[in-house]
Amino acid sequence: MSPRRSPASLTRPSAGRDPKKRILVICEGVVTEVQYFNGVKDHFKALPVDIAHCDVDGWGRDPLSVVKEAVRRRDKARSAARRQRDAFLAYDETWAVVDVDDHASLDEAIRMARGSGINLVISRPCFEIWLLWHYQDCPAALTTRDIQRKLAARLPNYDKHLPADFPYRDHQRAERRARQADPDHTAPNRKGRNPSTNVWLLVNGIARAGREEKRQ
């Protein structure tokens, strides 16, 4: 993970204010991923989690662009923390969420994430495999179209938007299926086999943030 490095110049504004872990999540997808992680955030009541998608003019959306955006936003928050002398404005963890698909920039994105302290989670072939694992086993290799077809069978009106009753509570079941499909895909900044995802690492991080929030 990427712990926040608090410069000596940063101070806590009040003695009675307890630290809360802040998490930044940058998604490659504009709709589904953002909607899912906002749902997870609400499910765990993890207030100090900020979720956004990569939307930078001239970059497009590919794994390298997502990692660059994660670095940019994290560093911007660090600068604000220094400027305002408030360590709580910085992020403790920064995550980027991408697919394998046919992206030529994925290997470069992994290298940049490792060198920049970004936790890059990668789904193969696409993020929807994680959603599908909330519902059913799916151990065999699949194309993105295969997964979308199977997900549409579970969600008849699925059009990238998740229903209000999506089973976020079944994330542990999805994690178990992901671990069974690729037992080695248990750390950020690596590619897994088809199918695979390590999104559960981020979901567990959001869950921890929610538990810490309740203890405040």
Where are these regions (language model features)?
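Conserved beta-strand elements of the Class I
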Residues: L24-I26
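A broadly used, surface-exposed interaction patch
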Residues: V56-R83
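C-terminal accessory helical subdomains adjacent to catalytic cores in phosphodiester-
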Residues: M1-R4, A8-R22, V34, N38-D55, ...
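Short acidic, Gly/Ser-rich segments with clustered Asp/Glu that frequently serve as metal-coordination loops
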Residues: G29-E33
